[in-house]
């Protein structure tokens, strides 16, 4: 995960689909990936990257490593929804909230799933704003989220 996006390939051995590791295989669709492990020294606990199906559209499945959680919808997520979720999980508000929930450097998927999020229509609206801004910075995410939180 680098600069708000999933960076692939990284040039490491065995980073491609490993068919014998079914637990690491996902259908190729839009996801928000969240790093599972962060160092104590890192400023942020929630570090996420956008992955869109169109990046590798020729594949039916993709493989991830167990060092990343992924956020997905039951019916998949639109690109706007992925960007909207990025606004939420890349914001300072949610990073601080997560640190209050969990003092560990490991980002737990159970705790991510328990975090409150707005309705999907709001998430998609935030995503549209982020796409239009063409700026994935924490500050931009904070500005968009604050508009919805504070009115």
Predicted regions and their residues:
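Non-catalytic DNA-recognition/assembly elements of restriction-modification systems
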Residues: 119-151
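Polybasic, glycine- and aromatic-enriched phosphate-binding surface used to engage nucleic acids
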Residues: 1-132
């Amino acid at each position: 995960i680098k600069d708000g996006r999933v960076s692939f390939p990284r040039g490491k051995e065995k980073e491609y689909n490993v068919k014998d590791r079914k637990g690491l295989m996902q259908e190729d669709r839009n996801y928000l990936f969240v790093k599972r492990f962060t160092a104590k020294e890192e400023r942020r606990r929630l570090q996420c990257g956008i992955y869109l199906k169109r990046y590798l559209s020729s594949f039916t499945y993709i493989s991830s490593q167990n060092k990343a959680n992924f956020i997905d919808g039951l019916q998949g997520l639109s690109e706007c929804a992925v960007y909207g979720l990025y606004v939420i999980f890349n914001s300072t508000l949610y990073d601080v909230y997560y640190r209050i929930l969990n003092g560990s450097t490991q980002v737990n998927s159970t705790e991510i799933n328990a975090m409150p999020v707005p309705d999907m229509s709001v998430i998609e609206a935030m995503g549209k704003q982020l796409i239009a801004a063409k700026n994935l910075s924490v500050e931009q995410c904070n500005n968009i989220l604050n508009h919805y939180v504070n009115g």
